[in-house]
């Protein structure tokens, strides 16, 4: 396996599109899914274009499980990690703020720690969100716009965004965030 990428949240819209792109470029893609998702789950339909590819490996894993994430990274030795996993329903984040913060913030810190402790040369991408801007009406919005999240989802993603920045500067890691807009 020459070019290996780990894509968390591979059954989501962005994860499945990214998997298709990477496979078309000759990568082996290791995708993680929550342990509660079975292969006949509706979300696997997003991967229909590549589900039978010999270059796609699916692993069941909780982003907050350090041991499981460490095992996957040490087993497949990816050089690139794309974290697209999240509890992404803003409305749901008001109903389940603890679970949202655990997945969307602590899960990211966990992944950063696994990368730092296993292979600090891994290039890591964190999917941030326009929800970090919250009720800020400035247009256009970019990384210099004031953050003002109003939902548990936005707050957790902002904390993760800042953790990526902290790890990049504190540990000299290649860790980058991209702010996604829908």
Positions of the model-derived regions?
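N-terminal Rossmann-like NAD(P)+-binding domain of SDR-like oxidoreductases, especially those catalyzing
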Residues: 1-181
């Amino acid at each position: 396996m020459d070019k290996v990428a780990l894509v968390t949240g591979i059954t989501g819209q962005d994860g499945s599109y990214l998997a298709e792109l990477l496979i078309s470029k000759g990568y082996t893609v290791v995708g993680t899914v929550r342990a509660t998702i079975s292969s006949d789950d509706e979300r696997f339909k997003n991967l229909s274009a590549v589900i039978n590819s010999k270059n796609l490996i699916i692993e069941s894993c909780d982003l907050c499980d350090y041991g499981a994430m460490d095992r996957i990274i040490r087993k497949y030795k990816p050089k690139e990690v794309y974290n697209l996993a999240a509890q992404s329903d803003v409305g749901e984040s008001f109903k389940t703020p603890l679970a949202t913060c655990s997945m969307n913030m602590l899960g990211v810190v966990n992944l950063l720690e696994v990368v730092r402790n296993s292979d600090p040369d891994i290039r890591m991408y964190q999917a941030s969100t326009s929800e970090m801007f919250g009720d800020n009406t400035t247009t256009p919005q970019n990384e210099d716009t004031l953050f003002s999240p109003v939902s548990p989802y936005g707050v957790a993603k902002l904390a993760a965004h800042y953790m990526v920045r902290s790890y990049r500067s504190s540990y000299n890691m290649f860790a980058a965030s991209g702010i996604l807009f829908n």
